[in-house]
Amino acid sequence: MKLYMSVDMEGISGLPDDTFVDSGKRNYERGRLIMTEEANYCIAEAFNSGCTEVLVNDSHSKMNNLMVEKLHPEADLISGDVKPFSMVEGLDDTFRGALFLGYHARASTPGVMSHSMIFGVRHFYINDRPVGELGLNAYVAGYYDVPVLMVAGDDRAAKEAEELIPNVTTAAVKQTISRSAVKCLSPAKAGRLLTEKTAFALQNKDKVKPLTPPDRPVLSIEFANYGQAEWANLMPGTEIKTGTTTVQFQAKDMLEAYQAMLVMTELAMRTSFC
């Protein structure tokens, strides 16, 4: 059995704020070590539970955070930030399941460091359904008929996953106090929880169905200001919804919608003031 792991950072236990997840800030090296250790707990249990291959995709920021020299020796790692499918790079229909580790809640909702890709996004929608990174990534997995078996992160990410994916296993390694304060498990306790939940998720795999994306989905992105919407609207095929900061794109399938999101958010970041 092949298992796919997408590993973000904001949902890792013990990381309360951006000083742990920004490579230019003081706690980053501590954060990436804990991130690597959490990934290893899940990888080790995946192999113990019968997986024959585990592919890990570093899915945070520049996507070169996981310490390959400390990673489980049997895992394969995708690292680096120029990826056609970003947080779900390398995922295809050869995988039996996916695991999302270190995930956080979507923008405009409570949760530790909650956001959706960039600071300027208020909401993502697929058709009329609000989604965050978790939802978009789960839809791409569903496009390949791959179920998301487990989501680990803060309590709000776990709740978001449970509302989105029936029977998904969740592992809440920290509880939200505010967007930059948490009650967290120690690394050892988090490791035990992740080990137990990974084992259960793999045992439970036949009860979880893929999150099937709609045919020809409409991607809508609500930005924080009109300047960001104007930049995103430079992508061919988009339009700004009248009287809003929402940019829409009619996609031929979920893969095109996902890549449109990547381009639109990249363009929106060119806005120099709010």
UniProtKB/Swiss-Prot annotation:
<keyword id="KW-0378">Hydrolase</keyword>
<protein>
    <recommendedName>
        <fullName>D-aminopeptidase</fullName>
        <ecNumber>3.4.11.-</ecNumber>
    </recommendedName>
</protein>
<keyword id="KW-0645">Protease</keyword>
<dbReference type="GO" id="GO:0046872">
    <property type="term" value="F:metal ion binding"/>
</dbReference>
<dbReference type="GO" id="GO:0006508">
    <property type="term" value="P:proteolysis"/>
</dbReference>
<dbReference type="GO" id="GO:0030435">
    <property type="term" value="P:sporulation resulting in formation of a cellular spore"/>
</dbReference>
<keyword id="KW-0031">Aminopeptidase</keyword>
<keyword id="KW-0749">Sporulation</keyword>
<keyword id="KW-0862">Zinc</keyword>
<feature type="binding site">
    <location>
        <position position="8"/>
    </location>
    <ligand>
        <name>Zn(2+) 1</name>
    </ligand>
</feature>
<dbReference type="GO" id="GO:0008237">
    <property type="term" value="F:metallopeptidase activity"/>
</dbReference>
<feature type="binding site">
    <location>
        <position position="10"/>
    </location>
    <ligand>
        <name>Zn(2+) 1</name>
    </ligand>
</feature>
<dbReference type="GO" id="GO:0004177">
    <property type="term" value="F:aminopeptidase activity"/>
</dbReference>
<comment type="function">
    <text>Hydrolyzes N-terminal residues in D-amino acid containing peptides. Among the tested substrates, the highest activities are with D-Ala-D-Ala and D-Ala-Gly-Gly. The physiological role is not clear.</text>
</comment>
<dbReference type="InterPro" id="IPR007035">
    <property type="entry name" value="Peptidase_M55"/>
</dbReference>
<dbReference type="InterPro" id="IPR036177">
    <property type="entry name" value="Peptidase_M55_sf"/>
</dbReference>
<feature type="binding site">
    <location>
        <position position="60"/>
    </location>
    <ligand>
        <name>Zn(2+) 2</name>
    </ligand>
</feature>
<dbReference type="InterPro" id="IPR027476">
    <property type="entry name" value="DppA_N"/>
</dbReference>
<keyword id="KW-0479">Metal-binding</keyword>
<feature type="binding site">
    <location>
        <position position="133"/>
    </location>
    <ligand>
        <name>Zn(2+) 2</name>
    </ligand>
</feature>
<dbReference type="InterPro" id="IPR033824">
    <property type="entry name" value="DppA"/>
</dbReference>
<comment type="similarity">
    <text>Belongs to the peptidase M55 family.</text>
</comment>
<feature type="active site" description="Nucleophile">
    <location>
        <position position="115"/>
    </location>
</feature>
<feature type="binding site">
    <location>
        <position position="8"/>
    </location>
    <ligand>
        <name>Zn(2+) 2</name>
    </ligand>
</feature>
<dbReference type="Pfam" id="PF04951">
    <property type="entry name" value="Peptidase_M55"/>
</dbReference>
<feature type="binding site">
    <location>
        <position position="104"/>
    </location>
    <ligand>
        <name>Zn(2+) 2</name>
    </ligand>
</feature>
<keyword id="KW-0482">Metalloprotease</keyword>
<comment type="subunit">
    <text>Homodecamer. A 20 Angstroms wide channel runs through the complex, giving access to a central chamber holding the active sites.</text>
</comment>
